[in-house]
Amino acid sequence: MFKEFKEFALKGNMIDLAIGVIIGGAFGSLVNSIVNDIFMPIIGLITGGIDFSNMFIQLAGEKQATLSAAKAAGATISYGHFITLLINFLIIAWVLFFFVKAMNKMRRKEEGESPNKTSSEEQLLTEIRDLLAKKK
């Protein structure tokens, strides 16, 4: 049983998956840093320093000054938090779009530089075509 587990755990696909998860986690941290440390301050400057995360509608109880106090007092609709998450999502999607676009461009460039190799099927079909052309 241990031998089977060892074979499973050390297969190339499992190791590739583990590496992908680790790199994905690191990439997620990098993208979050780009959003929170670069783009959100710029958006804050453009919007005049509006803090969307503290915008809410209080459904019950007395009117409160902060979201945390309003949540403690009763039901709230935290639409500002939703706006903040929506902005974060759009920025992350935008950054990832350009990253993937650049990666695809590099891939196409690399594929274009490789010599155009014909497959064995194509070679066989070419030979058959040539033989048929000679018989005519």
Swiss-Prot record:
Question: At the top level of its lineage, which domain of life is listed?
Answer: Bacteria
Gene3D superfamilies per UniProt: Large-conductance mechanosensitive channel, MscL, domain 1
Sorted keywords for this record are: Cell inner membrane, Cell membrane, Ion channel, Ion transport, Membrane, Transmembrane, Transmembrane helix, Transport
Q: How does it sit in the membrane?
A: Multi-pass membrane protein
The reply to whether Amino-acid biosynthesis figures as a keyword in the UniProt entry is no
Kindly report the protein's main subcellular placement as a broad class: membrane
GO molecular function, one example? mechanosensitive monoatomic ion channel activity
Q: Which InterPro entries match?
A: Mechanosensitive_channel_CS, MS_channel, MSC/AndL, MscL_channel
Family matches, as Pfam families: MscL
Q: Transmembrane ranges?
A: 15-35, 38-58, 80-100
Subcellular locations according to the entry: Cell inner membrane
Task: List, alphabetically, the GO terms of the cellular component aspect.
Answer: plasma membrane
What quaternary structure, including any partners, is listed in this protein's UniProt entry? Answer: Homopentamer.
What does the UniProt record say this protein does? Channel that opens in response to stretch forces in the membrane lipid bilayer. May participate in the regulation of osmotic pressure changes within the cell.
Query: Could you tell me which PANTHER family the record lists for this protein?
Result: LARGE-CONDUCTANCE MECHANOSENSITIVE CHANNEL, MECHANOSENSITIVE CHANNEL MSCL
**What protein family is recorded?**
Belongs to the MscL family.
Q: What is this protein called?
A: Large-conductance mechanosensitive channel
The record lists the organism as Bartonella tribocorum (strain CIP 105476 / IBS 506)
Q: What taxonomic classification does the UniProt entry list for its organism?
A: Bacteria, Pseudomonadati, Pseudomonadota, Alphaproteobacteria, Hyphomicrobiales
Q: Which gene encodes it?
A: mscL
